[in-house]
C-alpha cells in the first residue's frame, strides 16, 4: 500500500464488499452497485488506462454526476495520474480553456454533453475519448482480462498531484488547483469529530463531483465512513426522491434549502417530511443562509451545519458542530489546521490565512499565481476578510482586488461587482475577471426571479455600460444559476 486511498479501498472490500454502496436512477428506480463491484471496477479501469499509456497523465472527466464519474475519479487518483473534473454546465469556451490549461491526454465524457462534445472532438482530434455510455463498460472488461488480479497495481504516492479542480478567479482565467491524495484525505478526522456517520447512513448527493465539497466530503469520505450514496436527479425531483430514499446526510447551497423552505410553507408539509423523514446532518456552503430559514430547519430538529472553505484548502477550513446556535458563524475551525487573521482592524477582521495538510500543492503550470497565494511565512491567503473568535469563523466579505487592464489602468473588482448586482434583483453574486483585453463577469442568479430572455440581459448590461467609465464596461458576461455557486 502506497497511499491512504488504496488502504481504504482494501479495507472496504473486506468489510463491506457485499453491501450496496452507490445508487443511480435508471428509468424510474434507483439501481445499486455494491462496494465490491465498485472497487473491482476501479481496479480494472485503472488497469485499462495504464495499459493504454496514461500513467502520470492528466485525464478529464466531463458530464453530470454518475457512477462512471466516481469510478474514474478514484481509479485515476489512486493508480494512474491526475483527474480533471469539468462542470457539465460549462460553455464551450470554458471547456476548451480547461482542456488546454490542464493538458489532458484523455477525456472521459457523457453523451449528454451533445453538441459541445461534437465541437470538442473537432478542436482536439488527438485526444483519446472514452464515452460513458458506449465505451466505459468495454474498457473495464478489457482491463479485467489484462489484470493479474485485484489490488495488484501499485498505488501512487500520496504527496503527488492527483486531482485538478478549476476554481473561478475574480480577476483572471479560472485557476487549476492541484490536490494530492494527502490533501484530499486531510479533513476526514475533523468531519468525524462533528458527525457520527456509519454504514446505516444514507447520503443524497446533489453537489457536482467536479467541486471539492461534493467530491471529497460527500463522495470520497464515504469510503472512510461506509455510508450509502444516492445520486440526485433533477432539482424538480429532489423532494420526491428524498421522500423515497430517506437520507440522513445532505449537503447543498442556500438556494436549495430556500426552495425546500418555500415549498414546505406553500404545501403545508413539514420540512422534515420533504427531506425524507430521518435527516440527521445538513451542510450548507457557498454562501450564508438567512437566520430565518436556518431557524426553520432547527425548529424541526434539523440543525444546519454551515461550512466554509475553498478548493485550495481541499474544502477543509471550518464546519459547524451539530446544534450550533450561532447564526452568524460559518463554522468551527478544523482542529487539524493552523489559521490566523492577518493585519486585523479594530474589530479583529483581516484576511484569513491558513497552513495545514489540507492546503493545495499549487496552481497547475502557474508559478507566479502560486507564489502570490502564500505569504512569506507559508500561509495560504484566502482573499476573504474575516475573524476567528473562540475557534468560530466569521466572514465579512472578499478582499477588494485590483484589476490591471492592458493599458495600465487599475480598477476595483469589488466596485464592478456591486454595480452589476444593482442591475437586477435576481443577482446573488458576481465574479469579475479579465480574458485577454475583455472585462468579463460571471453573474449568478436566482432562477425563480431571473429574466429568461437573453435580450433582456443584453439590454440591462448595455444600460450599465452607459453609466460607468469606459474602463469598467463589461465586455462579456455569463448568466449562471446560483446553484452552481460553489467553492
PLM region spans:
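Conserved ATP/PPi-binding loop(s) of AMP-dependent carboxylate-activating enzymes
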Residues: 332-333, 345-373, 392, 407-411
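Conserved AMP-binding/adenylation subdomain of ANL enzymes
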Residues: 185-202, 209-278
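Conserved AMP-binding A3 loop
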Residues: 32-36, 162-188
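ANL superfamily adenylate-forming
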Residues: 114-158, 264-271, 480-481
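Conserved AMP-binding/adenylate-forming core of the ANL superfamily
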Residues: 21-53, 60-66, 70, 74, ...
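Gly/Ser/Thr-rich phosphate-binding loop
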Residues: 248-252, 260-326
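AMP-binding/adenylate-forming catalytic core of the ANL superfamily
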Residues: 107, 356, 362, 385-472
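Conserved pre-ATP/AMP-binding loop-to-beta segment of ANL
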Residues: 18-20, 144-166, 173, 196-202
Amino acid at each position: 500500500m502506497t497511499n491512504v486511498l488504496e488502504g481504504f479501498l482494501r479495507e472496504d472490500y473486506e468489510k463491506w464488499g457485499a453491501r450496496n454502496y452507490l445508487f443511480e436512477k435508471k428509468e424510474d428506480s434507483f439501481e445499486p452497485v455494491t462496494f465490491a463491484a465498485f472497487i473491482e471496477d476501479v481496479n480494472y479501469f485503472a488497469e485499462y488506462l495504464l495499459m493504454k499509456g496514461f500513467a502520470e497523465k492528466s485525464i478529464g472527466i466531463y458530464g453530470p454526476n454518475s457512477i462512471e464519474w466516481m469510478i474514474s475519479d478514484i481509479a485515476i487518483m489512486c493508480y494512474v495520474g491526475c483527474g480533471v473534473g469539468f462542470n457539465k454546465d460549462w460553455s464551450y469556451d470554458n471547456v476548451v480553456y480547461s482542456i488546454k490549461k490542464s493538458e489532458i491526454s484523455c477525456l472521459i465524457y457523457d453523451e449528454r454533453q451533445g453538441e459541445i462534445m461534437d465541437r470538442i472532438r473537432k478542436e482536439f482530434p488527438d485526444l483519446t475519448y472514452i464515452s460513458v455510455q458506449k465505451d466505459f463498460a468495454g474498457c473495464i472488461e478489457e482491463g479485467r482480462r489484462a489484470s493479474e488480479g485485484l489490488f495488484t497495481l501499485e498505488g501512487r504516492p500520496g504527496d503527488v498531484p492527483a486531482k485538478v479542480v478549476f476554481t473561478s478567479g475574480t480577476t483572471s482565467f479560472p485557476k487549476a488547483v492541484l490536490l494530492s491524495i494527502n490533501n484530499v484525505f486531510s479533513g476526514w478526522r475533523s468531519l468525524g469529530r462533528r458527525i457520527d456517520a456509519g454504514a446505516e447512513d444514507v447520503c443524497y448527493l446533489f453537489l457536482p463531483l467536479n467541486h471539492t465539497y461534493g467530491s471529497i466530503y460527500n463522495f470520497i469520505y464515504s469510503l472512510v465512513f461506509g455510508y450509502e450514496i444516492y445520486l440526485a436527479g433533477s432539482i424538480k425531483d429532489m423532494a420526491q426522491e428524498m421522500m423515497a430514499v430517506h437520507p440522513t446526510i445532505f449537503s447543498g447551497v442556500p438556494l436549495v434549502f430556500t426552495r425546500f423552505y418555500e415549498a414546505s410553507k406553500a404545501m403545508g408539509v413539514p420540512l422534515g417530511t420533504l427531506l425524507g423523514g430521518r435527516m440527521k446532518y445538513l451542510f450548507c456552503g457557498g454562501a450564508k443562509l438567512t437566520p430565518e430559514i436556518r431557524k426553520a430547519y432547527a425548529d424541526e430538529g434539523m440543525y444546519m451545519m454551515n461550512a466554509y472553505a475553498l478548493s485550495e484548502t481541499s474544502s477543509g477550513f471550518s464546519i459547524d458542530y451539530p446544534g450550533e446556535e450561532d447564526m452568524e458563524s460559518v463554522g468551527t475551525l478544523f482542529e487539524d489546521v493552523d489559521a490566523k487573521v492577518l493585519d486585523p482592524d479594530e474589530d479583529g477582521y483581516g484576511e484569513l490565512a491558513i497552513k495545514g495538510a489540507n492546503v493545495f500543492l499549487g496552481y497547475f503550470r502557474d508559478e507566479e499565481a502560486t507564489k502570490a497565494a502564500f505569504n512569506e511565512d507559508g500561509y495560504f491567503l484566502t482573499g476573504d476578510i474575516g475573524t476567528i473568535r473562540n475557534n468560530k469563523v466569521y466572514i465579512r466579505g472578499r478582499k477588494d482586488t485590483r484589476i490591471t487592464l492592458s493599458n495600465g489602468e487599475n480598477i476595483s473588482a469589488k466596485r464592478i461587482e456591486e454595480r452589476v448586482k444593482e442591475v437586477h434583483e435576481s443577482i446573488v453574486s458576481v465574479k469579475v475577471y479579465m480574458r485577454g483585453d475583455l472585462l468579463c463577469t460571471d453573474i449568478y442568479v436566482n432562477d425563480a426571479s431571473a429574466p429568461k430572455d437573453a435580450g433582456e440581459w443584453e439590454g440591462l448590461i448595455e444600460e450599465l455600460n452607459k453609466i460607468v467609465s469606459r474602463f469598467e464596461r463589461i465586455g462579456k458576461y455569463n448568466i449562471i444559476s446560483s446553484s452552481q455557486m460553489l467553492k
